[in-house]
Amino acid sequence: MKIGIGIPNQGSDLDPKIIPEWSRRAEAAGFSSLATAGRIAYPGVMDTVALAAAAGATSTIELFSGVLIGPAWPATLLAKELAGVDGVSGGRLTLGIGLGGRADDFVVDGLPMNGLGQRLDDDLQTYFDVWDGKEFEGSPNPGVPAGARRLPLLFGGAAPATFERAARVGEGYVGAAVPAPYVAPAFDQMRTAWKQAGRDGDPQLRAIAYFAMGDPEVARRKVEEYYAVTPEFGQAVLTGIAYGPEGVRELLRSFEDIGTDELILNPSTADLDEIERLAEVAL
């Protein structure tokens, strides 16, 4: 199982200037990927901006959006922006994408929180058209440079359509930031959908969890603040935070047991020292 680390781009105590340094340290420590959190109505840094900063500060580590709220964006603009991040990184971006579950994140006029599944399916076709270099409507020009590619896609969510969509156009699935026993049934659903779609091999199965090597009370408060708008789900997230070295080791075992290909460990605070502390235990 590979071990990635989250960028604290949505931490309420975030100084945005640390994102490049966080990214450099994570790459040097040997983590497999750097992942962002997707949120708009929160005092953080947009995931696309954090990914761009990480792309410029690193050279080998994978970049992952875990997960970006697709239908909250105008599809053409998002596709172009992501192609730019991927290009700057040298082709290291994997797009984790989902529908979104918080009404306050839908801030763009004309893009409300309804009809999200159909909108995402329509948006995906727009992404592919942009990434394939098709001309924009009313223009003789494509929106991306030559050499742009279709980004690998992983989908997050719990609706049956999520797994069908992932099996149809994606590379796999990313679970929510809850304990492994809650994620295991979703992994099983993804494996089943993959086989039913006639796909070869196995889907990528990624998971997300929070860790804290420092003060557990501070960590818990920060995570609780972030999920305050969805308190029932937030309680499930809180039960899965790994505290200290032994907590992290136990967390790793639990996700290995359910067949996780990569576990993204999200920091509970924006303390740069957490990177090395985690690496000593998890890598």
Predicted regions and their residues:
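Active-site-adjacent structural elements that line small-molecule/cofactor binding pockets in enzymes
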Residues: 1-283
